[in-house]
Amino acid sequence: MKIIIILFVTLVSLSAYSEYTVDQETINFDSNGVSIAYTVAGEENATPVLMVMGLMASHRLWGEYLVNGLVDAGYKVILFDNRDTGDSENLDRLGKPRIYWKFALSYMGIGFSAPYTLEDMAADGIRVLDELDIDNAHIVGASMGGMIAQTIASSYPERTKSLVSIMSTSGARHLPEMSRQNQDNFSGVGELDSEQVHAYGFYPEAMGRQLTAILQAGDRSEQIKTITVPTLIQHGIDDTLLPVEHGKHTAELIQGSEIIIYDGMGHNLPDEVVPNVLSDMLSFFDR
């Protein structure tokens, strides 16, 4: 099915992140009835950075260079798995949404419910901070994680030192869809094997639930306009899943925000671009 293939490509597009296994233990706690897993790297009293990964992607996909770079720069990096992903709780008990029907309702502008929402996932991130007795943190999110990070910044400004939204979107309906070339490439994508499933912390039945959360949120432009914290938008000029116009529109909505567009970056963080992404992020934090 095309929808499954699209979601698989979205996941695999993050595979340029090298696997990162932090030495510290992974801790699970209860977030309003859902077990959420997190781990921490860096000094206890360092300035915290909460990192939110994208659709169906484990926190391990942030990569060694970016996480170690933040730690080496003196930051405390908090990595967690979104609900239904990685070491956090699998929520198959919530059922499998009829995703084509959700797409149809979304296209027609008709509201619908979701097994859980972007707000729920944002609340999970805030509860991670609560578990660590952290008042506020820099919030960094990629792709769907960027949507969650935007939601944290708008709904919990007092917990947000700053927002970094990477290769993400406002969800506005007028923005361009993925390129035809990218759609044509989907036909060559195979199925995940069991080794890949475990490596990515990927629960196949969860794809529809997370996508439904994105569709249910719809156009978040009005919510994003309320963001008042310092904001950096980072986007790749070669992104064919969320074309660069998505990042530009998000920047236009947030007063005083900054956008940096990277050559050679698609809907991923390739090794040759990560040093610039990290450097720009650190400069932004230091202001």
Regions found by a protein language model. Give the residues of each.
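Acidic catalytic loop of the alpha/beta-hydrolase fold
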Residues: 238-242
